[in-house]
Amino acid sequence: MNVFLWVVAVFLAFVFLSTGLLKLVRTKEQLAATGLGWVEDFGPGTIRLIGILEVLGALGLILPAVTGIAEVLVPVAAIGLALNMLGAMSVHIRRKEPTLVVMTGVLAFLCAFLAWGRLVLVPFS
């Protein structure tokens, strides 16, 4: 189970690091042009904040475990990212984007599973 939790953590870290960095380096218009229509509902500052939170969450999924420092931050980061994805789900529900509702729901589930796994199943010592 420990290996599986690591695989989930690395996958989620990759997803959130890449999407978070995109939100930080591209303008709102560039993001909208790539098909991220939800950005029209938010200001540039909010989009940047989401990007910052995703990058920090991605780092929080890996760095504490790798360094052995404050390992409790791994499930905390996972819970934060799960909450972020629940917010994203509500946006996609409102915008009637069922594919994105499912995708963000799967990410929220994986984040919650990782948090549960690291808090209950295989906690760090």
Please name every model-derived segment.
Residues 1-125:
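Membrane-interface extramembranous regions
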